[in-house]
Amino acid sequence: MSDEASAITSYEKFLTPEEPFPLLGPPRGVGTCPSEEPGCLDISDFGCQLSSCHRTDPLHRFHTNRWNLTSCGTSVASSEGSEELFSSVSVGDQDDCYSLLDDQDFTSFDLFPEGSVCSDVSSSISTYWDWSDSEFEWQLPGSDIASGSDVLSDVIPSIPSSPCLLPKKKNKHRNLDELPWSAMTNDEQVEYIEYLSRKVSTEMGLREQLDIIKIIDPSAQISPTDSEFIIELNCLTDEKLKQVRNYIKEHSPRQRPAREAWKRSNFSCASTSGVSGASASASSSSASMVSSASSSGSSVGNSASNSSANMSRAHSDSNLSASAAERIRDSKKRSKQRKLQQKAFRKRQLKEQRQARKERLSGLFLNEEVLSLKVTEEDHEADVDVLM
């Protein structure tokens, strides 16, 4: 009897406001409903069972913009006709949207048969979307939608993915000798200044260091007691750095040995002129002695007089060569002492610069004040009368 009553049920408007929980059922044969519970709907066209269908409360909707999720327009054939299945996410107040999800119980719907395009798309959507935190509303519009829509563009939402963590490219070490001052970063400027100061202080003399200081800061005041010069970063420019590089190239250690060899050759020519003259006179005297000895057979008296004269000349020349050799030894000794003094001074200067750099980097001596005191002793010639 109940089957006949369900079969005689007339067409009812789908989810009308007057009947919030109508009995849904299109005209079909008797016994098609698998269960006798009220509100149960067997829709073979959609392949799903609805636990309850009710009108969505407009106050329950979120009035914020959410991601648009639209499935492809899939034509579902039925015995009575064909209706287009359309699903979307509500983005405002839409009175035509009806919720197929119960507020208390979540029912899993099998709207798409396994193996179809929409089944694959729905599985891909489930991986992109958290269904438990979203409020989806399904629509059944009356107008037909073209079934030739783009599946991927309609179904898959444009969900912002997390940015890929690309490995940071390591900055290649640039050749600072070829970069202008303005193209360097702060770290590169500090590194290059330390490199220049170390190169100049270790490979160049005092005169070259003073010239470079004048190039960097022409108004710098340097006293004879100063042992260091601090280079400020704002003093250097591209033009000054270019001049410093050219000066270092001109006075580099590769060029210095040639100049020193040239100076040494001139000095040796000037200092050993007496030695060469002495050696030449000695050789001439020895030759004259040999010639006089060879000619002794012809004239004995002449050879005796010549040999005595040549011996006296050779003795004076030997004294001259000894004094010249002594002068050379003295000059070599003085040059060696001068080199040792320069080496010790350079070593002490490097040590002071290293200590000053450590103090500057530590920051412990920023507020240091150096006071110079001068004590003058007065000569007390007269006795001081204490009793007065």
Curated annotation (Swiss-Prot):
Region (Disordered): 288-356
Biased segments, Basic residues type: 330-349
Keywords recorded for this protein, A-Z: Phosphoprotein
Modified residues (Phosphoserine): S316, S321
Low complexity biased stretches: 288-312
Family according to the record: Belongs to the FAM199 family.
Protein name (record): Protein FAM199X
Organism from which the protein derives: Homo sapiens (Human)
Gene: FAM199X
